[in-house]
Amino acid sequence: MEEKKSLPQGFEPIKYLESEKITSLFQIDKTPDWEKTIPELLNIVDKYQSGSTFDNYPYFTSQNASQYLPKLNIPSEIFTPIQLKELHSKLPYYHQYTNLRRVFSISVDGCAVSSFYDKCEEVNNSILVVKDEDGNIFGGYASEAWKPKFTFFGTGECFLFTFYKENRITVFNSTGENDHYMYTDNDQICMGCSDDYFSLSLRNNFLDGYSKKTRTYNNECLNDKDKFTVVKLELCAFDGN
């Protein structure tokens, strides 16, 4: 007869979880069975919430992800395929093998912030990408939907990126110094904030943009100047999202 495993007093085995994300974490953790104590489960959840891409796990490495060529339902007016592939490899592991669809573009949908919110309010995770008047390309990964919240929101999975230097991607992950990952109101969308400056701020119906270093992401200025004019802007969502 198989010996029944004992658990510490006050703990019960977890037999089933509805969340696909948590289920996938168990698979990545390669646990031989489903009997996990609550402390063990919380440890895995902490890894997930920290924004880790699980580079130390064999099934989800940046090296493997860099070989995947993502598809976009409508060709981007900003990204080149090589740039999109490079950015895709920096995403949280559960997006790295997922194709994209464009849900907003100022060339198609106009520059009104209200139109942006209408198109994007149900999109939980997205890539925001901007091209300025000098041809610089930069943006951010948003872990929550863009809605007018008038407060800071988002998670530590958010990050900023730029192709400004040598046309290779530079990523600025969250530092954990504050939780000012995203901000929205009726006039602007922003990412990162400290000392009254935003890492990325798009205002005046997406005509004007600003970028400063903040403690949220410890980022450099995302292009070559603090203030810029937005020429193109797109928001891409993930298939199934």
Go through each PLM region and give its residues.
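Phosphate-recognition beta-domain surfaces
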Residues: 1-241
